[in-house]
């Protein structure tokens, strides 16, 4: 909303003012204040007239058409009438001496009702000038009233009476009310069925508190509504919509109630629109909006949804409060009076007038203001003030035109300013105008006038200055027109579209349509045109080839069309109506020819008129005088694609393909990375004949075959031939054939049909295009017919296919003749043909046909002739010709035939021949049976059973051995034949259960079989075997019980089996039983701790296993078995590490000390005494962990330290050896030397080298493993025992323990295994690690 003017007359200040809009047109506004003058302004705030009054204005009103303004004033008995058409004022004497108090024009007639302070009434007919005075209508002042559509007049007065009179002044009804009435209105009452009745209901405010309803049809049954006291007084109310009342209260409340029967007074909406006060309500049915004012602001809401606040206008300068609101009937202007005596007029709805030329737009931004802008090129908008409210606007490259009726004003558009050029009158009322760079074309009354805009500047020839279309002799009316850079184009009521070429000043093209052309819309270049005919059908017309293309799904409500101005989308245009925009694309070059497609539709906001389309962005003009940009739904891909998912991208890809934006589609396919999307893009390229782009796409997805095909055709210039190839690639073969036949190479149609094996079509084409190809096509067609079972036609085509000069082809045809002859029943001809034919395959195929026809003799003859011995023998068997079968048997490979032959020989009692035939037939059961029953050769039968694993054969052999009393062999073969129950019973009866158990343990056996064996051994008190089979059948509790019962001779095996049982069972009760047994709780004899360790490992209880491992290692260490202790700790360390369980510090420390001890031997052996000495010092400092070898270790430490030059360390450990408990145990070989070291001490010492901590780079001794700087335990090198260095890191590829890369390489020169895990290792397997971060995790991180 925009304030267009304010009226601030000095004489009005300090008092409220009255005002009234001219009805219908709203061109005038009558305003009066305390100055005894009614001033009449136009809609732009210019004063047009005034009426001088003898006193203050009492009331004023416009008649229904807005032609006459009636005014009454104090101190006067005259009614003042101002005529809007003549701008003259007349006076009418009321004929009564009373002071007038009320005035109102009728809604439908020219009746004026005037009431007086004494209750008298005057009805004046302005049309006939008849006056009807009615005395005593009321006893006191008439204060309010209203007319209805039937010219009934309702009046209210200070006498608390409501009267209803007709236009003659006769009283029809009168009703007494309890308070003084005000604001009286007639309205339509809604009945139960919601149908409208006549205006028979009167609503009136009583005492400013109550809303009273009087039904003229039921005057004795009035209704009233009272409201909450805190709402204040009723200020005003308005009827709207379907029987609803909108009521404003002085305290700012705003209420909507229903008046439907049964709903009277039901509240629909309530809001406190204004905090302190509300002074007025105004409803615009045209805009469907309501305005309220108060608290120095105006609020406008939508009647459809009152919660929707359309706009809020603040008037901070009006500090004395606001007055009354009023709309013009068209809803275009809203006037507001104020308590201080000012009046403001706001523009609420503008006529949507606008035009576009290329990317420049011009649109109405106020009643007398046009804005010219170029949003695409970023030019600053230029505002042009115009002299009149325009009915039309046009913009060109350099000019702007506005106008109304038959007159137009032209302006020159400069860079930053606009200059008025001239105005021009036309011969009729202008419907529309179009601008060219030099010319303007105006359409009026069925004609178009083309004229120069600046004729004096161009120095043009006189005949080229102006021209009127159509010519005098042309009896048509022009209905629409357009100007492009080169042409004037217009459409007529006779259906002609004319192109007038401005440069040559002559017509160059015309198109005749069957019905009249209502609207035309050329594209920016004028090479294409959309027109709409009187049937509301849309077409695209191309003047270049004079072709039209119907626009599909074209809505009959379409108001206009805009072409895309973005140069890359030349064929895109939109058609719009009030609700939607439809995006169309004109595809000029497709394999199906030129066509128009509907790409999609976009919902347009209310009252938006499209002005410009650029790259999918639609610039629309709104009622508020602004422009709003919306993106078409068909161009959703122009938004950011980064966060778009595949489900949203696929519809966008389809949009791109419809719009022929292949580069954008390529990017989407790249993001989707989906072969289906790439194929869709490729097919679209083929459809649009974009061969190069299609090659690029198919190359991207690796479709080599089609890339090669497209490369071969891309240079073809014949449009139809190229389109035919592409149609074929897209599987549209009928289209491809039509295109090929229309091209310069029609034979391509025949080649395509042959490739597709469409032989019927190929034969039809060959008759005209290549008669010499008919035999070859006939043969192929015959093959297809044969396959379909049409043997008659197949035979005919085979016969047609014989050429006589093409041997290979003729042989194929003769083979077909032979087969079809047999199928048709001409067996002799077919067989003779097949026997003469050189093909073996033909003989086989004909033999098969004959065999199906039960012609066995001929079939076998052909099979044998064709060397198909299996088939021949089979047919001979069917005909019981065993002699022939026997002759063919050496050549037969089919087991089935051998079996049939074997059965025949067995029946004849020829067992040796039968057994050979059975073997050839792989019928081992029969072979075994014959060896056992007839040939008495059990050895051969047993060998065959073992080789073939025949179940039935094994049963037969088992029965055979059972008869011989060989129970072990019988059990073996019973198990082999899956007869486990029989084998078990036999083993039980003959005490052969061990054999049965051994055999069944290696078989795929059921739990029931294992349980049977376990129960047998349990009965025999063979606990180990019983436990083993209980374990196999999953009965863990019973298995454990038996293992624990085993005698001590089987103790080791039994405990191992018990551990396996508990590991599988994962049962806490069983686990505790076994632990108690291992700890000696049952028999007082604890078992070796290694079993407890294995138990915990089996249960995957790695922490408990670790504790046990530490105990075992400690025992091994105490016993002097240091390598065993090291290996136990290492294996546990590796297991815990693989399970990602934290390593106990005691385990890690013990492993490090033991490993240091092991390293001593390696370094001393290699002659590196310093490294050996340093490790011995570490071991000697933990000497309590080596109780079995304290003296030897200390002795070695003293010797190695002395050798390495660590004299002070040697002295310290020598002094320790001199203690009484150790002195006597020193080896005599070293005793004197050590005593000498103690007596003559040398405390010189080579200082230990320092190296940086890998965590914090603090320098510390190289054998120190705890950093004083960061307090971290540093990993140690498994080759030297020193702490690790960040830049010299490697790990053993087997155990993953770290080592100094340089030192481990040196060690591997003499050693072949890892010092930690003892796995084989060489220097080539080592890799230096540049980033050792993963090995430097602190304990907190772990």
From Swiss-Prot:
Xref: Pfam families: Beta-prop_WDR19_1st, Beta-prop_WDR19_2nd, TPR_IF140-IFT172, Zf_2nd_IFT121, Zf_IFT144_1st
Any Gene Ontology CC annotation: cytoplasm
TPR repeats: 736-769, 775-808, 840-873, 895-928, 951-984, 1020-1053
Disease field: Cranioectodermal dysplasia 4: A disorder primarily characterized by craniofacial, skeletal and ectodermal abnormalities. Clinical features include craniosynostosis, narrow rib cage, short limbs, brachydactyly, hypoplastic and widely spaced teeth, sparse hair, skin laxity and abnormal nails. Nephronophthisis leading to progressive renal failure, hepatic fibrosis, heart defects, and retinitis pigmentosa have also been described. Short-rib thoracic dysplasia 5 with or without polydactyly: A form of short-rib thoracic dysplasia, a group of autosomal recessive ciliopathies that are characterized by a constricted thoracic cage, short ribs, shortened tubular bones, and a 'trident' appearance of the acetabular roof. Polydactyly is variably present. Non-skeletal involvement can include cleft lip/palate as well as anomalies of major organs such as the brain, eye, heart, kidneys, liver, pancreas, intestines, and genitalia.
Induction of the gene: By androgenic hormones. Expression increased 3-fold in an androgen-stimulated androgen-sensitive prostate adenocarcinoma cell line compared with androgen-deprived cells.
UniProt protein name: WD repeat-containing protein 19
One Gene Ontology term from the biological process aspect of the record: cilium assembly
Alphabetically ordered keywords of this record: Cell projection, Ciliopathy, Cilium, Cilium biogenesis/degradation, Cytoplasm, Cytoskeleton, Disease variant, Ectodermal dysplasia, Flagellum, Leber congenital amaurosis, Nephronophthisis, Repeat, Senior-Loken syndrome, TPR repeat, WD repeat
Annotated function: As component of the IFT complex A (IFT-A), a complex required for retrograde ciliary transport and entry into cilia of G protein-coupled receptors (GPCRs), it is involved in cilia function and/or assembly. Essential for functional IFT-A assembly and ciliary entry of GPCRs. Associates with the BBSome complex to mediate ciliary transport.
Tissue specificity of this protein: Some isoforms are tissue-specific. Highly expressed in the prostate. Lower expression in the cerebellum, pituitary gland, fetal lung, and pancreas. In normal prostate, expressed in both basal and luminal epithelial cells. No expression detected in fibromuscular stromal cells, endothelial cells, or infiltrating lymphocytes. Uniformed expression in prostate adenocarcinoma cells.
Compartment list: Cell projection, Cilium; Cytoplasm, Cytoskeleton, Cilium basal body; Cell projection, Cilium, Photoreceptor outer segment; Cell projection, Cilium, Flagellum
PROSITE patterns attached to this UniProt entry: WD_REPEATS_REGION
Subunit structure of this chain's protein: Component of the IFT complex A (IFT-A) complex. IFT-A complex is divided into a core subcomplex composed of IFT122:IFT140:WDR19 which is associated with TULP3 and a peripheral subcomplex composed of IFT43:WDR35:TTC21B. Interacts (via C-terminal region) with IFT122 (via C-terminal region). Interacts with BBS1. Interacts with TTC25.
Transmembrane segments: none
WD repeat segments: 11-51, 52-92, 95-134, 137-175, 273-311, 317-356
């Amino acid at each position: 909303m925009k304030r267009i003017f304010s009226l601030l007359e000095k004489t009005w200040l300090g008092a409220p003012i009255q005002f009234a809009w001219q009805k219908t047109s709203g061109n005038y506004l009558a305003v009066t204040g305390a100055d005894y003058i009614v001033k009449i302004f136009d809609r732009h705030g210019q004063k047009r007239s005034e009426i001088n009054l003898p006193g203050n204005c009492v009331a004023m009103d416009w008649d229904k058409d807005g032609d006459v303004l009636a005014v009454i004033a104090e101190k006067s008995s005259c009614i003042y009438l101002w005529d809007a058409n003549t701008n003259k004022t007349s006076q009418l004497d009321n004929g009564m001496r009373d002071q007038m108090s009320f005035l109102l024009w009728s809604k439908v007639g020219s009746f004026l009702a005037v009431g007086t302070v004494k209750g008298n009434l005057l009805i004046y007919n302005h049309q006939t000038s008849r006056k009807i005075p009615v005395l005593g209508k009321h006893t006191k002042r008439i204060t309010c009233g209203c007319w209805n559509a039937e010219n009934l007049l309702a009046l209210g007065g200070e006498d608390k009476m409501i009267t209803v009179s007709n236009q003659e002044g006769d009283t029809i009804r009168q009703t007494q009310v309890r308070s003084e009435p005000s604001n009286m209105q007639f309205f339509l009452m809604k009945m139960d069925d919601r149908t409208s009745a006549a205006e028979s209901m009167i609503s009136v405010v009583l005492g400013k508190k109550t809303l009273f309803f009087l039904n003229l049809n039921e005057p004795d049954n009035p209704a009233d509504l009272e409201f909450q006291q805190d709402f204040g007084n009723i200020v005003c109310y308005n009827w709207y919509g379907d029987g609803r009342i909108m009521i404003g209260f002085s305290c700012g409340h705003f209420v909507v109630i229903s008046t439907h029967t049964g709903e009277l007074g039901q509240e629909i909406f309530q809001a406190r629109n204004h905090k302190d006060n509300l002074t007025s309500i105004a409803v615009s049915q045209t805009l469907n909006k309501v305005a309220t004012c108060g608290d120095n602001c105006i609020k406008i809401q939508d009647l459809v949804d009152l919660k929707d606040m359309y706009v809020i206008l603040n008037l901070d300068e009006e500090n004395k409060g606001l007055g009354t609101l009023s709309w013009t009937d068209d809803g275009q202007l809203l006037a507001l009076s104020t308590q201080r005596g000012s009046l403001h007029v706001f523009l609420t709805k503008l006529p949507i007038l606008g035009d576009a030329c290329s990317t420049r737009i011009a649109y109405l931004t106020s009643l007398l203001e046009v804005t010219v802008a170029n949003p695409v090129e970023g030019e600053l908008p230029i505002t042009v003030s115009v002299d009149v409210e325009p009915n039309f606007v046009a913009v060109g490259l350099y000019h702007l035109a506005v106008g109304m009726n038959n007159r137009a004003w032209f302006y020159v558009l400069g860079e930053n300013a606009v200059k008025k050029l001239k105005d021009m009158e036309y011969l009729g009322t202008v419907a529309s105008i179009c601008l060219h760079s030099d010319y303007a074309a105006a359409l009026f009354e069925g004609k178009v006038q083309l004229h120069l805009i600046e004729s004096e500047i161009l120095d043009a020839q006189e005949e080229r200055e102006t021209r009127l279309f159509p010519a005098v002799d042309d009896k048509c009316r022009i209905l629409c027109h357009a100007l492009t850079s080169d042409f004037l184009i217009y459409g007529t009521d006779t259906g002609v579209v004319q192109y007038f070429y401005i440069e040559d000043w002559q017509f160059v093209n015309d198109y005749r349509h069957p019905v009249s052309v209502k609207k035309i819309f050329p594209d920016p270049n004028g090479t294409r045109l959309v027109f709409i005919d009187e049937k509301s059908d849309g077409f695209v017309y191309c003047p270049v080839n004079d072709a039209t293309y119907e626009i599909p799904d074209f809505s009959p409500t379409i108001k206009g069309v805009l072409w895309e101005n973005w140069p890359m989308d030349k064929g895109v245009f939109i058609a719009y109506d009030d609700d939607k925009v439809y995006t169309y694309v004109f595809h000029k070059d497709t394999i199906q020819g030129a066509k128009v497609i509907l790409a999609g539709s976009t919902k347009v906001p209310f009252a938006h008129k499209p002005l410009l389309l650029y790259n999918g962005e639609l610039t629309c003009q709104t009622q508020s005088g602004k422009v709003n940009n919306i993106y078409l739904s068909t161009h959703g891909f122009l938004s950011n694609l980064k966060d778009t998912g595949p489900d949203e991208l696929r519809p966008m890809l389809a949009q791109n393909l419809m719009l022929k934006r292949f580069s954008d589609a390529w990017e989407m396919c790249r993001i989707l990375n989906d072969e289906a999307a790439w194929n869709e893009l490729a097919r679209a390229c083929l459809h649009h004949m974009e061969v190069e782009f299609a090659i690029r796409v198919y190359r991207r997805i690796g479709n080599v075959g089609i890339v090669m095909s497209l490369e071969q055709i891309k240079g073809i210039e014949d449009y139809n031939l190229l389109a035919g190839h592409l149609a074929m690639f897209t599987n549209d073969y009928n289209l491809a054939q039509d295109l090929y036949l229309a091209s310069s190479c029609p034979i391509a149609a025949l080649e395509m049909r042959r490739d597709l094996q469409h032989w019927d079509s190929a034969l039809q084409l060959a008759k005209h295009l290549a008669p010499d190809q008919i035999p070859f096509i006939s043969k192929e067609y015959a093959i297809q017919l044969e396959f379909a079972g049409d043997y008659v036609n197949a035979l005919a085509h085979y016969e047609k296919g014989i050429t006589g000069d093409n041997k290979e082809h003729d042989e194929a045809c003769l083979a077909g003749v032979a087969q079809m002859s047999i199928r048709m029943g001409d067996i002799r001809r077919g067989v003779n043909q097949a026997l003469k034919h050189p093909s073996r395959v033909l003989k086989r195929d004909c033999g098969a046909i004959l065999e199906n026809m039960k012609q066995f003799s001929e079939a076998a003859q052909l099979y044998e002739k064709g060397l198909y011995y299996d088939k021949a023998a089979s047919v001979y068997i069917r005909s019981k010709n065993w002699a022939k079968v026997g002759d063919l048997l050496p050549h037969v490979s089919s087991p089935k035939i051998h079996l049939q032959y074997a059965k025949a020989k067995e029946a004849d009692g020829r067992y040796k021949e039968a057994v050979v035939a059975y073997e050839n037939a792989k019928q081992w059961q029969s072979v075994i049976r014959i060896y056992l029953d007839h040939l008495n050769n059990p050895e051969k039968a047993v060998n065959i059973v073992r080789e073939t694993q025949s179940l039935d054969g094994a049963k037969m052999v088992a029965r055979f051995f059972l008869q011989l009393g060989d129970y072990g062999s019988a059990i073996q073969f019973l198990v082999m034949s899956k007869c486990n129950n029989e084998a078990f019973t036999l083993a039980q009866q003959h005490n052969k259960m061990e054999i049965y158990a051994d055999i069944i343990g290696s078989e795929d056996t059921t739990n029931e079989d294992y349980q049977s064996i376990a129960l047998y051994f349990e009965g025999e008190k063979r606990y180990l075997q019983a436990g083993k089979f209980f374990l196999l059948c999953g009965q863990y509790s019973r298995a454990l019980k038996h293992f624990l019962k085993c005698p001590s001779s089987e103790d080791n095996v039994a405990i191992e089996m018990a551990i396996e049982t508990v590991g599988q069972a994962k049962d806490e009760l069983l686990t505790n039983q076994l632990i108690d047994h291992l700890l000696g709780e049952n028999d007082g004899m604890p078992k070796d701790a290694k079993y407890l360790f294995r138990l915990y490992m089996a249960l995957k209880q790695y922490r408990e296993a670790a504790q046990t491992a530490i105990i075992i290692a400690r025992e091994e260490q105490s016993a002097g078995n240091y390598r065993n202790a090291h290996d136990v700790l290492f294996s546990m360390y590796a297991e815990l590490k693989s399970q990602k369980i934290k390593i106990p510090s005691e385990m890690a420390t013990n492993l490090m000390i033991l490993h240091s001890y092991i390293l001593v031997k390696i370094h001393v052996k290699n002659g590196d005494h310093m490294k050996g000495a340093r490790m011995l010092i570490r071991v000697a400092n933990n000497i309590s962990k080596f109780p079995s070898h304290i003296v030897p270790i200390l002795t070695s430490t003293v010797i190695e330290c002395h050798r390495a030059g660590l004299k002070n360390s040697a002295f310290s450990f020598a002094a320790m050896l001199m203690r009484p408990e150790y002195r006597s145990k020193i080896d005599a070989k070293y005793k004197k030397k050590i005593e000498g070291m103690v007596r003559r001490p040398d405390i010189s010492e080579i200082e230990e080298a320092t190296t940086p901590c890998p965590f914090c780079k603090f320098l510390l001794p190289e054998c120190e493993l705890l950093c004083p700087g960061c307090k971290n335990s540093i990993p140690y090198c498994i080759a030297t025992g020193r702490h690790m260095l960040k830049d010299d890191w490697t790990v053993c590829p087997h155990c993953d323990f770290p080592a100094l890369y340089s030192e481990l390489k040196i060690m591997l020169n003499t050693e072949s295994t890892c010092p930690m895990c003892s796995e084989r290792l060489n220097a080539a397997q080592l890799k230096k690690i540049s980033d050792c971060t993963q090995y430097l995790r602190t304990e907190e991180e772990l």
